[in-house]
Amino acid sequence: MLDVILIGGGHNALAAAAYLARAGLRTIVLERRELLGGACVTEELWPGFKISRAAYVAGLLRPALVEELGLLRRGLKLLPRRPSSYTPDANGPGLLLGPDEAASLAQIRHYSPRDAERYPQYERVIDRAARVIEPLLDAPPFDPAHPRLSDLAPLLRALRAGIGLRSDITAALSLVLGSAVNGITSWFESEPLRSTLATDALIGAHAGPSTPGTGYVLFHHLMGDTGGARGVWAYVEGGMGALSEALADAAREAGAEIRTNAEVTRIGVRAGRACAVELADGTALEARAIVSGADPARTLALLGREHAPADWAQGIEALDFRSPVMKINLALDSLPVFPSCPDAREPGPWHQGTIHLGASTLAELDTSFAAAERGELPERPMIELTLPSAVDPTLAPKGKYVASLFVQHVPPTAKAEFWEKNRERFADRVLACIDELSPGFSGRVLHRDVLAPPDIERVFGLTGGNIFHGAMTLDRLGPLRPIPGWARYATPLPGLFLCGAGTHPGGGVMGACGRNAARVIEKALRGRA
C-alpha cells in the first residue's frame, strides 16, 4: 500500500511530495491536467509564445525550500525585476520604483519632496514587520488551544524580531491591521505613489483600498525578497511552469511517482478514515494518508458531505471564495510605448516590472470595487500589465513579446451567461484603457486568452476562481486558516490532510503550505503527531 496520495499537482503539492518522499514515504501525485503545476504553469498557447497562464511572478518563494530541494541546480532561474514597477503619467514623468533607493526617491520627489523624505522610513517599517512574520511562514501555525513545544522556536524568533520594531510597532500595526487607505494616506500625499502602493493590497481580494483588513494583503505581497532584496519579485526563466518542473524533479528523484491526466473524482472512506481515491477512469488507489492540494471547498466536494464531520463541513462552506480577478494573456508583435518611452525599440526599465494602468487614484480603485460589488463591470478597472519576455526572451519569438494583464474588479458572482456576453467586450475595454497611456497598444495584439472567474475555476480547479484558495482576510490567517481548530493541515477525518493555499500561510507562489504540511503528515504517519 502507498503511504501518501496527493490530490493535484500544484506547486504546494509537488513540494509536499518531495519532502514526504525524501522522508522515505511511498508517495504518488495525481494531477488531472496534462501538465503539472496547477496555477503555476507555462503553456504555449500560440506557436512560439510561452505563457504563464495563471500565476505570473515569483517573489514569495521560501528560501529554505529552494535550498533544501536544490531547485537552482534543477534549472530554476529567478530573474529579478529591476525596477519592480512603473506607473505611467500623461502629465508627468511617471513613477519608477525598485530596489535602487536613490533612483526611487528621485522619482517620488517629482511628485512630493515630503513623500520622498518619508519613503525610506516606510520601507524600514515594512522590512522590520516582515522579519516578525517570516519565522511564522516556515512552520505550522501556532494553535493556542493545543500548544506544542515545537511551536516555541518560530514564536521566539518572531518575538525577538518584534522587540526590534520598538518605536515602529505602532506604524507596523496600523499598516498590517487597517485598511490600505488608512495605512498609505498616513504616510504619503501624492496620488501616483498612493495608488501604486495600494494595488498590492487588492491583488486577488474582493475589496477596495478603503475596505478594512486590506492592509494585511498589502503587507503579504511586500514580503518578497528575491535575492535577499525586500519587495523584489522575479520572473521565472521559461515561465512559472519551470518552477513546478523543478519541484517535480526533486520529488521524482526522492522516489515519488507523478501521474498526469489522472483526475481524482472521489475520496474513499472506510471505517471512519480517509483511505483511498477513485480516478475518472475507474482506477482506485489506497494509502495511509490522503493529502489534498485542492482548495478546501473542492476537497469537501471530493469527500462528500456525508463523510465530513458536520462542524468542519459547515466551516468550509462558510469560506469566502469570491474572486474579482480576470486574467488576460497576450501575444504582442512589438513592445508597447509609454509617455516615458515614446519610441520603444528595445526593452527599457519601464518594461521590466509591473505597469500600473486603468484606475489611477485611490478613489478610482474604490469605484472599481463598488461597481463589481453591484454586479457591474467597472469603467476604469485596476490593470497590472507585465511583459516577462522583456526580461526573458526565451518566452517569445525574436522581436515579439508576451504580456500578462491582471485585471480587477469584475463581479465575482456573475454567472457563465453573463460572461458569454461580456467576456470579450470587457477585454476590449481593458485594452482601450491601456491605449490611453500606451498609444496603439491594442493594435499590437496578435492573440489573446481571456479568463474570467468561471474560466479560472474551470481550467485550474480554483473554486470561484479565487487565486488564494479562499479569502486572505484577518479572520482567515494563521491559526484561523482555513477554519479555527483545523489550521495544522489535518482535518477532523482521520487520514485526510490539506496542503494547498487554503492553509497557512496562504496564497502566492511560496511553497510554504506544502513544506509545512509535509512535516505534519510525516509525524502523523510515524506516530509522532
Label every PLM stretch briefly:
Residues 2-145, 472, 516:
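N-terminal glycine-rich phosphate/pyrophosphate-binding loop and immediately adjacent elements
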Residues 190, 194-210, 375-388, 440-504:
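A glycine-rich dinucleotide-binding beta-alpha-beta segment and adjacent secondary-structure elements
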Residues 501-522:
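A conserved FAD-binding loop/helix module that cradles the flavin
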Residues 1-35, 39-40, 108, 114, ...:
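Structural core of flavin- and non-heme-iron oxidoreductases
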Residues 1-4, 22-23, 477-479, 483-484, ...:
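Extreme N-terminal leader/targeting segments of oxidoreductases
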Residues 110, 241, 297-303, 331-333, ...:
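Conserved FAD/dinucleotide-binding core of flavoprotein oxidoreductases
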Residues 127-254, 462-477:
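Active-site/ligand-binding neighborhood in enzyme catalytic cores
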Residues 235-237, 256, 263-396:
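Mid-domain catalytic core of redox enzymes
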